[in-house]
């Protein structure tokens, strides 16, 4: 793990005012969308590999160019395909017991395609007008997150970008608590976990992580986030419990499945580390108890 923290002040206008590059949205398409062409792209997208999503995105974008960038569903499909390719390649910029996966290689992916995905998503929401649903908001959120990630979301947590990121997460959480396993609560948990003081909050991080489990279900991602955040807060017993549960859990949505193998692998590593820390704590407690007992014996009158 959807960690979620967060480009420059201009990104704060992403909730409707952000300037986008590329062709602007037209009032109506000059040509009807070719359903056969879109169907071919849909079939590629369903394969859920980075390469197939790349191919699907190109077909969607070529069709958008041909028809005038006015079809909301096609715009969102294109954004979703680009998002998915990035999610697969970079493990969704999720959190780990070591922090994040903001590596140079991953940042290069986000720099190349993040803004592209956001432009498509923003146009899609504009074309929808007042018919914005959970899917559209989720696609825009992921695109925004990826568009900022190449500059490190953690470093931008205290900027307008961080504010916009949090507001988008809160909107998903409030309006669509069951969408994608309560992804709104999940991304807020990651935000509060990685953001520096005064925005970061261990209490809010674990509260939102547990809320995602309660409202969105005990999915792989949701359990993994509780485990990682608990580990970061030195609650190794809870971390071990939830890592065990995550290892046995299934992804709750296609987007979770995109980086499920990574979360499973990290959960196994996290479990081993949590158990190691618990063992060390037990040894320390035994040593303290032994020393206390020895001191008590010395203090007894002879």
List the predicted regions and their residue ranges:
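Short, solvent-exposed mixed-charge patches
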Residues: 300-302
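Universal eukaryotic N-terminal targeting presequences
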Residues: 1-16
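Short amphipathic alpha-helical heptad-repeat segments
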Residues: 236-240
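Mid-length scaffold segments of soluble, non-membrane domains
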Residues: 175-177
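Short coil/linker segments at helix-helix boundaries
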Residues: 22-55, 69-73, 77-130, 134-171, ...
